[in-house]
Amino acid sequence: MKNKNVIQKMREKIPLIHCITNYVTINDCANILLSFGASPAMCEAYDEVYDFVSISSALYINLGTLTKEQETAAVLASISAKNHNVPVVIDPVGCPAIKRKVEVINRIAEVGRIDIIKGNIGEIKFLAGMDSETRGVDSLDNGENALNACTQLAKKYNCIVAATGQKDFVSDGKRGSVIKNGTEMLTKVTGAGCMLGALCAATCANFEDKLVSTTAAILSMNIAGEKAYEKAQLPGSFRIALIDNIYMISDEEIWERGNVEWK
């Protein structure tokens, strides 16, 4: 897998990533995409999304602070993505607490398309119909059977599924990866998961093997976090160092430093 130039190909293309995301972390998602080498657009007006998706490289839908207006825009955007062959990444933030979000995901799967679902372990287990431990938008799950949950959900939606936690798990329904990089400090800043979803959209935009591209996105975030923590041990300075290290991350670094078990 070390010959997979996911980041290089992404930076050569400078993909336009259309984000319909939450109000808490919208700025973080835009900044990390810019640092990574992509071009973010935070467009969510119903009258604009269909046309804008048609010129985008990927669509990122984050359900964190889902309003009715965002819901209708997200569904329409997914229809445009299906019609224009634009990959879609879904982040089901808080779905165990708010069941309407599951209905939105199912609606998008029905009328649009889903290429990647990226959530924490609790969210992914919940969507897979398994017992999970969550508190609001946070997972309290220990990760047991997480890869199995990813595999089941990947088969259900015919997409890539990633579950994040102390270890991270990715599956396409047949193949999988387990990632053991990262730092606990990523849980001490708001929006690390949302930013990761944006990176997944960037790496999948122009890379055919989305299991590999999703694994590369997670490695990029986790290794940038590890390096950031080496220089910044407090949350405020860590957030800034994280963005800086995403800017400097490379394919060579993620595959050499990455602790990945391929399944």
Swiss-Prot record:
Q: Which family does it belong to?
A: Belongs to the Thz kinase family.
Q: Where does substrate bind?
A: M42, G191
Listed under GO biological process in this entry are: thiamine biosynthetic process; thiamine diphosphate biosynthetic process
Q: Tell me the residue numbers annotated for binding ATP.
A: K118, T164
- Molecular function per GO: ATP binding; hydroxyethylthiazole kinase activity; magnesium ion binding
Annotated InterPro entries: Hyethyz_kinase, Ribokinase-like
Q: Quote the protein name from its UniProt record.
A: Hydroxyethylthiazole kinase 1
Q: What is the lineage of its organism?
A: Bacteria, Bacillati, Bacillota, Clostridia, Eubacteriales
Give the species this sequence originates from: Clostridium botulinum (strain Langeland / NCTC 10281 / Type F)
What is catalysed by this protein?
5-(2-hydroxyethyl)-4-methylthiazole + ATP = 4-methyl-5-(2-phosphooxyethyl)-thiazole + ADP + H(+)
Please state the Enzyme Commission number of this protein.
Answer: 2.7.1.50
Function comment? Catalyzes the phosphorylation of the hydroxyl group of 4-methyl-5-beta-hydroxyethylthiazole (THZ).
Q: Give the pathway annotation.
A: Cofactor biosynthesis; thiamine diphosphate biosynthesis; 4-methyl-5-(2-phosphoethyl)-thiazole from 5-(2-hydroxyethyl)-4-methylthiazole: step 1/1
Q: Nucleotide-binding: is it a keyword of this entry?
A: yes
Q: Which UniProt keywords apply?
A: ATP-binding, Kinase, Magnesium, Metal-binding, Nucleotide-binding, Thiamine biosynthesis, Transferase
Q: Does the keyword Transmembrane apply?
A: no
Q: Cofactors per UniProt?
A: Mg(2+)
What SUPFAM superfamilies does the entry give? Ribokinase-like (SSF53613)
